[in-house]
Each structure stands twice: as structure tokens, then as C-alpha cells.
Amino acid sequence: EVLAVFEQPFYEMNSDVVSQSLCLALDEIQDPGNLGTIIRVADWFGIEHIFCSQGTVDVYNPKTIQATMGALARVKLHYCDLPSFIASLKDIPVYGTFLDGDNMYEKKLTPHGLIVMGNEGNGVSAEVANLVNERLYIPNYPPQRETSESLNLAMATGIICAEFRRRMANV
């Protein structure tokens, strides 16, 4: 068995990072494996800040830490009053993922802003949804084919992040 002891870092809340880079916001995420995988996805795509609602699972849950595969050392998590934080962002794109959103492949995406990902079962909360100014949807393929109702949260986050970064590479 291995035991590690370290000081839990505290990162100061700074909305300026959202105006200068792409960040994630997680609204009431419950599954520690999903959180860990999302942290790993963020690290892969160079996203350094994740803002979490107070009700999001603890980042130091053993399953979360294991799923990050070390990415937790490079990605900064901020637990906050998520609706208040988002409301404080001025002139910054706030993207959210919704089953009734617009096809993300047809929308203009920016290299900075906040991408909100919602709870595994309930999606983005109504309070946070009211603050989103760009509602996105990941379309299934082919469009008329009957498929699963939705994607796993971590998988959806990976697809969204990949599309944002793909667009940046083509700028």
C-alpha cells in the first residue's frame, strides 16, 4: 500500500482567466470517475481551470484522483457558488451543453470562454442555464438514426473540448 500526504492547494478565484483562455464549469457533477476523467480531458486539451459548483463531488475522492492519472497536478479546480461566478463574467461567452441546443459544428466558437457541463442525470441546472448565452448540442450520426438518448458526461466533455481546440488550430 502507498500513502501520500500533501497540502491541498487553494487557487484564488479570478474571472480574468475566463476572458483569456478556455475554461470548464461543472454543475453538480456526482460521479467521481467522471470528474477525474474530465480533469484528464482538460489537461489533454490545455484547459487549466475548472470551476465547480459546491455540489460537485470532492476532487480528492480516491476514485477521482485515480481517474485523473496525474492530471490533477496541472489543472486547477475552483469550488464556488457557480451561478454567482458565471453572473460575474461580463462580455465573455458562456457555452452550455443541452439536448435542445444548437448543433455545435454549425456554431461560431471562440478560443476563450466558459463551457458549462451539467449533472449526469439532470443536465445543467435551471439557475445556471439562465446564465448560458450559447446553447450547444452534440449531434448524433447519422442525424435521423435512432440512438442512445445521451452521451456519458466525460465523453461529451471530450468531444466538446476537441471541437473547440480543432477550431483554434484552424484560426
How would you label these PLM feature ranges?
Residues 1, 21, 112:
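Conserved catalytic motifs of the protein kinase core domain
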Residues 4:
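Glycine-rich phosphate-binding loops that contact phosphosugars or nucleotide phosphates
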Residues 10-101:
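RNA substrate-binding interface of SAM-dependent RNA methyltransferases
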Residues 44-45, 59-73, 126-171:
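Structured adenosyl-cofactor binding patch, chiefly the S-adenosyl-L-methionine
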Residues 95-148:
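Active-site/ligand-binding-proximal alpha/beta "capping" segment
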